[in-house]
From Swiss-Prot:
GO terms for biological process: translation. Keywords: Ribonucleoprotein, Ribosomal protein, RNA-binding, rRNA-binding. This is Large ribosomal subunit protein uL22. Part of the 50S ribosomal subunit. The keyword Ribonucleoprotein applies. GO terms for molecular function: rRNA binding; structural constituent of ribosome. The lineage of its organism: Bacteria, Thermotogati, Thermotogota, Thermotogae, Thermotogales. InterPro entries: Ribosomal_uL22, Ribosomal_uL22_bac/chlpt-type, Ribosomal_uL22_bac/org-type, Ribosomal_uL22_CS, Ribosomal_uL22_sf. The gene is rplV. It comes from the Bacteria. This protein binds specifically to 23S rRNA; its binding is stimulated by other ribosomal proteins, e.g. L4, L17, and L20. It is important during the early stages of 50S assembly. It makes multiple contacts with different domains of the 23S rRNA in the assembled 50S subunit and ribosome. The globular domain of the protein is located near the polypeptide exit tunnel on the outside of the subunit, while an extended beta-hairpin is found that lines the wall of the exit tunnel in the center of the 70S ribosome.
């Protein structure tokens, strides 16, 4: 007899089936890359992520290349990975790709103690980020939208 573990209020097999269906329904003209547990403050990384959203991939690489921020180097690597996923896994053309969305979520926080006067201490929170970049093919997206009409 198979014992099913509940997750998010539903049985595990149903959870995995729904997840598989959701992934299958994702458009084939889209590729993503995720970097998790990156040691940078989400607030600092979001300003860089906002600057490349909606831009062509080549333009986004140029923006990230000349940005002096630490987050730019990290997001550039994630973008490079998303483009490689699009080209290798989906066979998309790199010239037609654009940054569909780029967002930064909070990760866990490392807590450190900072000694203060009279034997007390303050807690310092070292924040982490989860960075997601999704690229899409403009031409394939237009063709898919025309087919729906």
């Amino acid at each position: 007899m198979q014992v099913l573990i509940k997750r998010n209020g539903m049985k595990r097999s149903k959870f995995h089936r729904e997840r598989k269906e959701k992934l299958a329904s994702m458009p084939i003209y889209e590729a993503r890359a995720v970097a998790k547990y990156i040691r940078i403050s989400p607030r600092k990384a979001r300003s860089v992520a906002n600057s490349i959203r909606g831009k062509n991939v080549s333009e986004a690489f140029t923006i990230l290349e000349f940005s002096p921020k630490k987050a730019a180097r990290i997001i550039k690597n994630v973008l490079k990975s998303a483009v490689a996923n699009a080209v290798n896994n989906h066979g998309l053309n790199e010239e037609n790709l654009y940054v569909y969305t780029c967002y930064v979520n909070d990760g866990p926080r490392m807590k450190r103690l900072w000694p203060r006067g009279r034997g007390s201490a303050d807690i310092i929170q070292k924040r982490m980020s989860h960075i997601t970049v999704i690229v899409r093919d403009r031409e394939a997206e237009k063709a898919a939208n025309e087919e729906k009409k």
